[in-house]
């Protein structure tokens, strides 16, 4: 563990980088059993700087927790989406269908799609929270009440359900990795 930290410190110095301990965070990723065995480590020292451990870190817009359950990421994504859905709900009566659909894609759908391939192994209950976001969005775009079944709305809007979007994204990534249009490291 310490040799890896020394190598990291050496790499920083080779690339003229300085570690800012005030902005740096560390976490231990693994199973809950493995994390319990490493619970006695409270901080790490890298090049004389002490970095404390946190339960969740944000990396490229994805919130990672220690056990890689993505619960916090799904909760934050849902919260952000519902904030924008609320804004769309307030203006929905003033815009036509095509504009509402465009706003829905611009403000909410991309949040559901961003890095969703990492959720492929998540339990259905976790994906269901994101599906509720999409169902609410479809109801607002189509001006329907909240008690109507949402599957016909998704079909009418030509939107895949969230679990299908995840599978489609994985299939797309796989196809691009196998085709000639992908970078050599994939």
Regions of interest found by a model, annotated:
Residues 1-186:
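Hydrophobic/basic alpha-helical segments
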């Amino acid at each position: 563990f310490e040799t890896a930290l020394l190598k990291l410190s050496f790499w920083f110095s080779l690339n003229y980088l300085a570690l800012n301990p005030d902005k740096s965070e560390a976490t231990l990723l693994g199973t809950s059993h493995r994390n319990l065995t490493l619970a006695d480590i409270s901080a790490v020292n890298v090049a004389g700087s002490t970095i404390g451990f946190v339960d969740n870190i944000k990396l490229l817009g994805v919130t990672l927790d220690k056990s890689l359950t993505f619960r916090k990421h799904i909760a934050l994504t849902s919260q952000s989406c519902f904030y924008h859905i609320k804004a769309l709900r307030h203006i929905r009566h003033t815009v036509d269908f095509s504009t509402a659909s465009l706003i829905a894609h611009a403000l909410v759908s991309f949040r559901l799609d961003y890095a969703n391939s990492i959720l492929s192994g998540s339990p259905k209950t976790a994906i269901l929270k994101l599906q509720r976001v999409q169902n609410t969005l479809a109801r607002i775009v189509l001006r329907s009440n909240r008690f109507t079944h949402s599957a016909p709305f998704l079909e009418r809007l030509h939107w895949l359900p969230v679990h299908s979007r995840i599978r489609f994204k994985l299939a797309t990534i796989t196809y691009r990795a196998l085709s000639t249009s992908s970078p050599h490291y994939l």
